[in-house]
Amino acid sequence: MAKKVVGLIKLQIPAGKANPSPPVGPALGQHGVNIMEFCKAFNAKTQAQDGMIIPVVITVFADRSFSFITKTPPAAVLLMKAAKIPKGSSVPNKDKVGKVTKAQVREIAELKMPDLNAFDIEAAIRTIEGTARSMGLEIV
């Protein structure tokens, strides 16, 4: 029989840098999860993506065990990395802070495809382009 799910926790944690301090510790602690066990498992799974922010969905079961699924980094983080900028524009319609090429947008869309609610790559590209525009990035 399947285990009874008692909680779903969604967090965004830097890859390979999960530790028991906030926000990880309190979020897991209130569900009774072994925090160090999660941190070790998460860090081992995300070592290759060092420096990226990784969304993770943790399923907590009634016996205090857990499982987790890592997702692809947020589109905004991938776009900032592609454009080599520290943050997006505070006034995206007026100030353009960087440029990304169509090829870079397509590459990001292909990477994000499993997590996007788009049926084909063209729809995914349009989604990523919209994110880029709202960050003040120019698509060339």
UniProtKB/Swiss-Prot annotation:
SMART domains: RL11
S-S pairs: none
Pfam assignment, any one: Ribosomal_L11
GO cellular component, one term: cytosolic large ribosomal subunit
Entry comment on modification after translation: One or more lysine residues are methylated.
UniProt key word rRNA-binding: yes
Matching CDD domains: Ribosomal_L11 (cd00349)
Keyword Cell membrane: no
GO process terms (BP): translation
GO molecular function (one): structural constituent of ribosome
Key words, A-Z: Methylation, Ribonucleoprotein, Ribosomal protein, RNA-binding, rRNA-binding
Function, in words: Forms part of the ribosomal stalk which helps the ribosome interact with GTP-bound translation factors.
Subunit: Part of the ribosomal stalk of the 50S ribosomal subunit. Interacts with L10 and the large rRNA to form the base of the stalk. L10 forms an elongated spine to which L12 dimers bind in a sequential fashion forming a multimeric L10(L12)X complex.
NCBIfam families: L11_bact
Name of protein: Large ribosomal subunit protein uL11
Native source organism of the sequence: Syntrophotalea carbinolica (strain DSM 2380 / NBRC 103641 / GraBd1) (Pelobacter carbinolicus)
Lineage, broadest ranks: Bacteria, Pseudomonadati, Thermodesulfobacteriota, Desulfuromonadia, Desulfuromonadales
Gene: rplK
